[in-house]
Structures are given as C-alpha cells and as structure tokens.
Amino acid sequence: EFRRVLFRSAAPVLTAILYLMIFGHVLEDHVKVYQTISYTAFLIPGLVMMSLLQNSFANTSSSLIQSKITGNLIFVLLAPLSHMEFFAAYVLAAILRGLVVGLGVFLATCWFTTITFQFPIWILAFALISAAVLGALGLIAGIWADKFDQLAAFQNFFIMPATMLSGVFYSIHTLPSVWQTVSHFNPFFYMIDGFRFGFFGVSDVSPWFSLSVVLGFFLLVGGVALRMLATGYKLRY
C-alpha cells in the first residue's frame, strides 16, 4: 500500500519535470512573460499548482468511486458521521495529498532556476483554498459518477481543459482579447495567477480579486457537494 501511494505521488512529479524540461528548454529564449523573470521560473509555480489541483481532485473522486464500485461505501455511510463531517474528512484528505504532491513538484523543479518567495502567505492561502475547491469538485464527480468511464469523462472534459487553459504555460496578456475575456471566466486561472503572485509579486489580476473568486467558487462547489451528501444523492438511494 505504501508503494502504491508513493507511485501515485511520484508520477505527477515526473510529469511536471518533463513539462519543465520540454517547454522551458524550447521557449526559454523566445518567451518573456514578466520583466526580470525567466520563462522557466514562470513555469514552476504553474506546474506546482496544476499538479496540486489535479491530485486534490483525484484523491476524493477516485476514493469515492472505488468505494461505490467495490461496495464498501456502505461501511462509510454506516459510521455515525454527519454529512458535514463526511465532507470535511474527504476534503482535508484531498488538501493533504495536493500539498504533498505540490511540494514534491516544487522540490524537484526548483533546481532548474532561482525561485523567490515574495509573499509566502499568498502561496499558502491559494494552495490551501484551491486544493479544497478541487477536493469538493472531486466529491461531486465521485458522487455523480456510477463508473470509472463517467469519472474519466468529467476529468478529461472539465478538469484537464480548465487547468491547461488557466495560464500554466503563459500569461493571458499574450492572448488575443477574445481569449483574454474567456480566460477571466475560468476559476482555475485565478487559482494559478494568485499562487504565482506569491512567488514573484506580479500577476495578471489583483490577488485580492483572485482570492475572492476562488473563495466564491469554493462556497459554490462546497455547497453543492454538501447538498448531495445531505440528500444522499446516488449514495443512499
């Protein structure tokens, strides 16, 4: 079991290193996003947050769907836990996994360039809240899905595109005006932009606005997840 957890945590770290080596090597001398900040340095916070988001989502969604399919979810439901406690347990576990993977990605990639920490409190705030958002989204997906194919569709058609189009590899100011407008409707963009602000002190939008959007999105998805748990949607009926 320990080796399985280690493998699941190591895989996203290796993926992030590959992204950094390929994009950083190819575009380092051709892309300048912020003054005095190299493209490789710009990439690292985005890759850290991308890994954190994807693994926070995977932790709750895969745990829940696996329990539903194998039939052992009944033992969780029989425990004297309220829907609030159920929600907190799954989301806190997602936060922990997301932070562990994110830290692993950072430690593996920070050797490629010099990274600064302008505002560590912003880094921590966006990491925690964003992991909670994806943990709650994972709960929604895990409750809704009846099989792994449905969960994969949710991840492939929503989580992955929203993450990849959130400014991990670019600043939205480099996009045409139409796509800049579209990007502002993507809550994942505010997670990554605010997280990156904590490292460099510069961002595409105000970190306070990003924080308000991310908090609002958490209240939305958290409310939906709690409602699904309270009514027993696809869990008790």
Role assignments for model-derived ranges:
Residues E1-Y237:
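Hydrophobic transmembrane alpha-helices and immediately adjacent juxtamembrane helices
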